[in-house]
């Protein structure tokens, strides 16, 4: 292609590029997930990072610890790394697209996996093959629930924490999702 361009034949360069390495635009779609959608994926995956197999912790369990111990376990509302405990990057679960949407992957549950914020940032728009990563099998939420049972039980025992809108919102979503999975609000799986 470059040889054709150097020879002044832009049309031939375009043809070669289109044939051997074409640009395929992907429609941009906005992605926003409800707390319940996130929790369904986290429970389905057993609160495991599907890229590393590492245990993840319920988002509001981490935030509750930050509310209780802000000096020792700080969390910045806008994820400022210099003002947040590193656990928020290592252990905080998020949804990632196994096949990136930017690369043509579908924004649907069959293409969603649980991962940490850290690995989500590292993966970005790359495929597992490009990174040399593999997909770990899902965990079992009856063995590890990401401290969901602890979180709901702690809020129930400390109702003043319901004043925190983030914690209250995640509490409602967690109780609902645990109901879908037939877990009591405060059942703790073995660790």
Give the predicted meaning of each segment.
Residues 14-80:
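Short, charged surface segments at domain edges that flank catalytic/cofactor-binding sites
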Residues 55, 118-122:
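Cys/His-rich metal-chelating microdomains
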Residues 54-112, 126, 133:
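Histidine-centered nuclease catalytic patch
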Residues 77-94, 100, 142-166:
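Short Fe-S-cluster ligation motifs
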Residues 152-191:
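Short flanking/linker segments adjacent to small metal-binding domains or redox-active Cys/His motifs
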Residues 49-50, 113-117:
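Cys/His/Pro-rich metal-binding microdomains
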Residues 1-30, 133-137:
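Mixed-charge, low-complexity interaction segments
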